[in-house]
């Protein structure tokens, strides 16, 4: 994540890379995906929930910081605040991972991402939206 944010790419490319990194990680680690969505191990639920929350908070913070930096240097004001943009990105990621787990790992979280990205990008960056 830090490598993505440190790159000289546009915020659009960074956001796409961030989303694809997380989706690919969950795709390659289905057991972790299941755990992060609340399927606890026996006796682990009380300890697991705060750790999962902390992990998602860290992902959101990294995304939000990158979006804030990008907006501070952007010429056009995006249609959403960095907080709203981050919420949208995380909801899309969590939704794709939920679908993956619910399908018993048959429907990849990266399936159709390349086709969906242009629409996501417009929603995140289109100043005329």
Residue ranges and their predicted role:
Residues 37-44:
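Short helix-capping/turn signature of helix-turn-helix
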Residues 1, 26, 63, 67, ...:
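Hydrophobic recognition helices of helix-based DNA-binding modules
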Residues 33-37, 49, 71-119, 127-129:
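Hydrophobic/aromatic-rich alpha-helical bundle segments in the mid-to-C-terminal region
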Residues 12, 16, 53, 57-60, ...:
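Non-membrane alpha-helical structural segments and their capping/turn regions in soluble enzymes
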Residues 28, 46-73, 83-87:
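Amphipathic alpha-helical packing segments from all-alpha helical-bundle domains
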């Amino acid at each position: 994540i830090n490598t993505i944010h440190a790159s000289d790419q546009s915020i659009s490319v960074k956001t796409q890379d961030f989303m694809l990194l997380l989706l690919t990680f969950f795709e390659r680690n289905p057991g972790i995906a299941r755990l992060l969505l609340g399927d606890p191990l026996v006796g682990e639920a009380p300890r697991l929930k705060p750790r999962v929350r902390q992990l998602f908070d860290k992902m959101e913070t990294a995304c939000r910081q990158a979006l804030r930096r990008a907006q501070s240097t952007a010429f056009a004001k995006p249609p959403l605040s960095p907080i709203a943009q981050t919420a949208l990105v995380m909801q899309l990621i969590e939704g794709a991972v939920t679908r993956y787990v619910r399908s018993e790992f048959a429907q990849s979280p990266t399936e159709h991402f390349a086709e969906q990205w242009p629409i996501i990008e417009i929603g995140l960056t289109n100043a005329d939206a």
